[in-house]
């Protein structure tokens, strides 16, 4: 049985992209997904580190919060 809600989603619902900026002090960054830039907060990084390097390849789920599309359930790819 899955332990996280995002592990229940099909692979078609997950997307991949690259971290294009991240401010460690604020905890905010952006992921580029084919020209579409999505905001994310460090609490969405699933490994719990709350930090990520620019240029890191990631998979994620797109969610809408307060009318803004954001990246959620962010997994760092090897």
Residue ranges: model-predicted function:
Residues 1-15, 76-78:
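Short boundary/loop segments of OB/S1/cold-shock single-stranded nucleic-acid-binding domains
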Residues 14, 37, 69:
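Short, mixed charged/polar active-site loops
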Residues 25-30:
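Short aromatic-glycine-enriched beta-strand elements
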Residues 32-34:
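Short strand-coil-strand connectors
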Residues 36-44:
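A short macromolecule-binding patch
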Residues 63-78:
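OB-fold/S1-family single-stranded nucleic acid-binding modules
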């Amino acid at each position: 049985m899955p332990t996280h809600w995002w592990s229940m989603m099909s692979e078609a619902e997950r997307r991949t992209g690259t971290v294009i900026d991240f401010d460690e002090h604020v905890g905010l960054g952006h992921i580029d997904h084919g020209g579409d830039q999505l905001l994310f907060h460090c609490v969405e990084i699933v490994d719990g580190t709350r930090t990520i390097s620019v240029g890191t390849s990631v998979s994620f789920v797109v969610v809408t919060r307060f009318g803004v599309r954001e990246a959620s359930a962010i997994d760092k790819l090897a």
